[in-house]
């Protein structure tokens, strides 16, 4: 077991610079959200508290903090602290007064057979038992912080409706896009690392689109008009 070098983008530039970065991109996302639109942010203790504070400074209303429990998390290398076995997901809407989408019945009555925390026909709780990314989901290459499709599919199904537009400003390997396309949502992804964009995310999303072409007509046309790539002026660079 060795530590993972996640790249320059994952290195702290100091508390103040890190917070300014998070505040900047969260404010940029908030400007693009319609009233009642929501944002999901995932992270560990290294950054999630700064993000939570930035959401509140921006005037957004935090709906939930989700604990994603990883039953197969990697062991702690130093043996001097507890093994990190969860990440936090923050879910917030544009303001306290706005109405947001929450597909309550899909979460209560949906089928989540591998989540031992979810009891059949009971309300979905804020602790999610989801294993790390499957090997099959890394067929196009490895990304150091790739999230499992099951996690992003749950996020998409819980808080959006078919045809909604989802933006991921840190697309990485494209998992958010896969979840969006798979469930009939539109998608815009931004990724500053060309190796991940061209080597993993683009072919992975194209493969997901190709699946639609192999499905016989059922009277309900799948969403093949998803906007995969979008040029946005002034895309933020890490640390600016």
Where do the language-model regions lie?
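S-adenosyl-L-methionine
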Residues: 202-239
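Core catalytic lobe of class I
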Residues: 1-199, 240
């Amino acid at each position: 077991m060795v530590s993972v070098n996640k790249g320059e983008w994952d290195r702290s530039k100091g508390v103040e610079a890190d917070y300014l970065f998070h505040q900047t991109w969260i404010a940029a996302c908030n400007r693009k959200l319609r009233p009642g639109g929501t944002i999901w942010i995932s992270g560990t203790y290294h950054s999630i508290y700064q993000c939570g504070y930035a959401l509140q400074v921006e005037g957004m209303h935090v709906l939930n903090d989700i604990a994603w429990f990883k039953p197969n998390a990697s062991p702690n290398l130093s043996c001097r602290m507890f093994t990190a076995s969860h990440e936090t997901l923050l879910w917030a809407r544009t303001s306290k007064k706005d109405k947001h989408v929450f597909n309550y019945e899909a979460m209560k009555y949906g089928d989540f057979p591998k989540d031992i925390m979810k009891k059949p026909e009971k309300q979905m709780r804020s602790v999610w038992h989801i294993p790390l990314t499957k090997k099959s989901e890394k067929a196009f290459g490895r990304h150091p912080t790739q999230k499992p499709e099951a996690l992003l599919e749950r996020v998409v199904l819980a808080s959006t409706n078919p045809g909604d537009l989802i933006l991921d400003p840190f697309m990485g390997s494209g998992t958010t896009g896969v979840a969006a396309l798979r469930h009939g949502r539109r998608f815009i992804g931004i990724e500053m690392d060309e190796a991940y964009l061209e080597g993993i995310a683009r072919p992975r999303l194209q493969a997901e689109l190709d699946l639609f072409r192999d499905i016989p007509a059922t009277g309900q046309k799948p969403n093949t008009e998803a906007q995969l790539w979008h040029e946005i002026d002034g895309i933020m660079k890490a640390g600016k």
